[in-house]
Curated annotation (Swiss-Prot):
The protein, known as: Uncharacterized protein TP_0940
Organism encoding this protein: Treponema pallidum (strain Nichols)
Highest classification ranks of the organism: Bacteria, Pseudomonadati, Spirochaetota, Spirochaetia, Spirochaetales
Domain of life, per lineage: Bacteria
Length: 46
């Protein structure tokens, strides 16, 4: 149970970061999507 919970927590931020990076890369603009929608784990100064 502990391992499963830790794994889920680690996968969540990773998934968000990946999506943010994709949006930022596709947009190519710093404030394109509002810094990739305010989400925990996503760099605001990308």
């Amino acid at each position: 149970m502990f391992f499963e919970k830790k794994r889920e927590s680690r996968v969540q931020p990773m998934h968000i970061q990946a999506g943010c990076a994709t949006i930022a890369g596709t947009r190519g603009d710093r404030g394109g999507y509002g810094a990739c929608f305010p989400a925990p784990g996503c760099p605001d100064t990308l």
